[in-house]
Structure formats: structure tokens, C-alpha cells
Amino acid sequence: RESPSSRMECYEQAERYGYGGYGGGRYGGGYGSGRGQPVGQGVERSHDDNRNQPR
């Protein structure tokens, strides 16, 4: 299910927004980066939500 292209998309987004981790802080809510934005800020969740959620 996790294709390399989709994973690269996540990393690209993270790099674009300046956050490290999956999907960036804005889309991922910070559950991938932890250093970008605090968790709970991820109101704008992308389709990567269910894929990148560790919990």
C-alpha cells in the first residue's frame, strides 16, 4: 500500500514546509516530526493521515 512515490510526496511536503518527519507539521499535525508544530495543530490532515499515524 505504501508506494515509494507517496512516501516521497510526504517527504517533499515536509521539506517544503520546513518540518521534518512525515507529511510535515501542517498536514501531519506533528505526529511525524514533533519538532515542527505541536500535536493537535493538524487540523488540515491530508490523505496521509491514516498511513503515517504511528499510533
From Swiss-Prot:
Statement: the UniProt record of this protein carries the keyword Protein transport: no
Record's compositionally biased regions (Basic and acidic residues): 44-55
Keyword Nucleotide-binding attached: no
Record field: compositional bias (Gly residues): 18-39
Signal sequence, renumbered to the chain: none
Assembly mode: Monomer and homodimer. Might act by homodimer formation.
Chain coiled-coil ranges: none
Organism for this UniProt entry: Psidium guajava
GO biological process: defense response to bacterium
Protein name: Glycine-rich antimicrobial peptide Pg-AMP
Function: Has antibacterial activity against the Gram-negative bacteria Klebsiella sp., Proteus sp., E.coli ATCC 8739 (MIC=72 ug/ml) and K.pneumoniae (MIC=32 ug/ml). Has no activity against the Gram-negative bacterium S.typhimurium or the Gram-positive bacterium S.aureus. Does not have antifungal activity against the human and plant pathogenic fungi F.oxysporum, A.fumigatus and R.solani.
Alphabetical keyword list: Antibiotic, Antimicrobial
Region annotated Disordered, chain positions: 18-55
